[in-house]
Amino acid sequence: MYVTDTHPLVYFAQMKPARLGRRARRLFRDAEDGRSLIYIPAIVLWEVWMRVVEGDFTLPMRFDHWCRGFDEAPGFAVEPLNWRCIDESRQFSFNDPFDCLIAGTAAHLGMPLIRKDADISASDLIETIW
């Protein structure tokens, strides 16, 4: 079981697997086939929406339909934001509050985070996979 950051999920949704690292690409394929489980922090969905509105990302369908697809997919689960995730996020000192909350969710669940960025990888507080 794994937790995804925003960019890997968007690359997967945009059908751009070449932008994912080899291990991340395999994990998303396995989840798509129901052989693995990737948790999507609720805050990731909010960040995706904000980035769509800003024009940074495009999705292959309407946002609500895209989110609903994760409810129906056996290899994905949306993880709600709760106080435990927020509490865990306090150990991270990244400039981006989304990064802190996503990393806090991974720490709370005790799962590796699918992410490329070196700032979280260098923290040694959670395992990252790319």
Go through the PLM ranges and name each one.
Residues 2-7, 41, 95-99, 117-118:
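Histidine- and aromatic-rich ligand-binding microenvironments
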Residues 37, 75-77, 126-127:
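Conserved beta-strand segments of alpha/beta enzyme cores
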Residues 48:
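Phosphate/NTP-binding elements of NTP-utilizing enzymes
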